[in-house]
């Protein structure tokens, strides 16, 4: 009789054989990704090479510590992997030092806070209602609980960052750390001006480039490398890698602090299979094809924004410099939640999003956030995004007219045709 361990480790035994419930859930998710248009700005389609690395035997290896200084034996090959990830990341962003161990962008930010701040210190970040991220000092987040959080905003008229307000708040509150970054800001950031303001109050400047990393690597968005004391990012989104985080800098002293903050400060053993997948993604991003891809990502976002505006929809800031397009639904008297639910039923996934100075609850919102990275990976071009804008408008008009169930059914068939023309995996 075969014992359990023999059955589990028999190479002939697949996931389907061992755990059909999980297998079927994964298969259903694959079919969802294949049959829907993924317009969530923080999502992308990782390559098979990235996923192969993440599903590798490195899953089995515990490697607490850093290269050459592990607390476990048998780490010579995972050292090779981590070293490649670091070298490639530094080359990608033209920096000297990198930590590739953070499990997420949020933990990368926490590592910076642990490196530079003590509880009660003042930080200055973009308000979440104006496009900032939870970890930039939002009240429900630890960054808003541990530190005195001052939030800057955007200009009410243009919806662009109000750098004069950033400077005024910095001079008034003397923050120890200024954060330049966002999760829902479609335009370019003036990292040079941020650094000038930071220098005036002797503050550190953290650039959180989680959304813009791929664009920066490809030269389609300004790089903070010359200006920020320290930079954090995720490795998925526009970098098209596994879900994870990184911290990079040109300052050796800050790098050493980050090393200690990540381990042993915040984490134990790194996820070596994920670090391997990060390394693969960095290699992909260093290839000329990646620059061409990112160029199309930005072009497609501009086309999407323009097409939505032609339908009479209000696009925040009037356009985009990135992969992000934000739509304000207040003129249509619709909520983000109502619209996103209808769009999903029609086969288009995006996310509800607060718009500047939104009075709706975060669970409802008055806007939508779209991103073009995933569907550009799929192969969609400008003309396809014009059609997608038409489909989005059809759904929104259906909501306004109260016949959205009929519209959703029609749009879903059109979405299926696009997806069939551009298959994934």
From Swiss-Prot:
Main location per the UniProt record: cytoplasm
Cross-referenced SUPFAM superfamilies: PLP-dependent transferases
Swiss-Prot/TrEMBL GO biological process terms: glycine biosynthetic process from serine; tetrahydrofolate interconversion
Subcellular location: Cytoplasm
Pathway(s) where this gene product acts: One-carbon metabolism; tetrahydrofolate interconversion; Amino-acid biosynthesis; glycine biosynthesis; glycine from L-serine: step 1/1
Site (Plays an important role in substrate specificity): 236
Gene Ontology MF, one: pyridoxal phosphate binding
Protein name (database record): Serine hydroxymethyltransferase
Organism ancestry: Bacteria, Pseudomonadati, Pseudomonadota, Alphaproteobacteria, Rickettsiales
Recorded name of the encoding gene: glyA
